[in-house]
Amino acid sequence: MIRYEIKKIFSKTICRISMIVLLLSLIISCYFAITNITYIDEQGVWHTGIAAARDLRTEKQKWEGTLDEEALQKVLDEYRKINEEYPIRQGDYTANMLHDSKVQGISEIKDMINIGFCEFRDFNYYRIDSVSKDEVGKLYENRVKSLEKWLGSEDAEGLFDENEKAFLLERYGQLKAPLYYEDYDGWRSVLHYAQTIVMLVM
């Protein structure tokens, strides 16, 4: 029965063409999902593809683990060491790529620190530069405080009632800390293109 249905599908030229187009679209979507991950080598050269994803994962796995105060301080030390040896120079593309190649292993943790010490709903790429080793351990506590401060500001006025504010603060306070870090670039790329791939398959 199944064999008959398959033969029926491929018996018409229009069906064969449609299947070829569908297959090509699926291959292209999978290709973009794979090449969406980039890795910068020690010479500051960009790479994409499976090998790049593997190399980037290797870099990030060095920092896999619980992000407690000690781990966050190590990230801060590493970032400052990189800044001293490979400083960002305005207009110097090569120097900046070398800097990024050294930072890519800790980039997500660095961004987490930036977000944790910025005002709520704000982001400052260089906020980490002014965070001290004593402060960085208060990352999780600080994100709750920043939400509380924002909810009491004029920016949030009229957006939430008191019950909703209390609910948001409660949910933020329930975050299981410290967080556990591991590389998720592969999953992020798959999820980014998952909708397109599922639509094509269906």
Predicted regions, residues:
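Lipid-exposed faces of alpha-helical membrane segments in multi-pass integral membrane proteins
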Residues: I20-I28, V198-V201
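Juxtamembrane non-transmembrane segments of integral membrane proteins
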Residues: L26, C30-S101
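Non-transmembrane alpha-helical segments in soluble domains
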Residues: I6, L76, E148-L151
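Membrane-proximal, non-transmembrane alpha-helical segments
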Residues: R121-V201
